[in-house]
Amino acid sequence: MAREIREIPPATERLLAEHDLVAAVADRIRKAEPRVVVISGRGSSGNVGTFLRYLFETRAGLLVSTSAPSVVTTYRQSLDMRDAVFIVISQSGRCPDLVMGARSARKSGALTIAIVNDVTSPVALACELTLPVGAGLEHAVAATKSVVLSMVISGQLIAALTSDHALREKIKQLPQRFSHALTCDWSAWRQLRSSACRVRNWARVWIGTGARDRA
């Protein structure tokens, strides 16, 4: 995981060089004139989706909804997704429910976009457009590198969609800022985190939730 984190600055620099692709996807969104954006993702990719939701709503003024894959996978219900943009975020691009959701959204009239690490994955192939994050092979379960790069390309997309020059310039500084973060002394933070964990554990014992959490 530490090695993959150290790979983030150069990977971000490579990602920022793909501005033409991001601009083309932003142009397709603009031409689609969507009424709503639907975002699909699980785990850490779902957290990236929350980040992208705030960008869409605060920067572009577009309403965003979170996808519920079980509507398609369990209840077998298709939705009217005309005038919608459907964005699926996935590191592996192989979760069956995300693939089914993307296929259903595309069939139902949405402009479908995959923010994905593996461009040959089923999720990428199910979508009309793909934004590759270029994280490469990851071994750490946390997938920190692809999560960070997915957030970076999310920022790029919104900057291009809204023609936000100030945001674009801030994003250009990220490789340098990430590199600087790797040189910082994080020992004080580790001590604070350790103390916070102890306080949390004692709080669980005090209010009686510890045994329940372990059950």
Give, region by region, the residue ranges found by the protein language model:
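Short, surface-exposed connector motifs at secondary-structure boundaries
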Residues: 33-37, 195-200
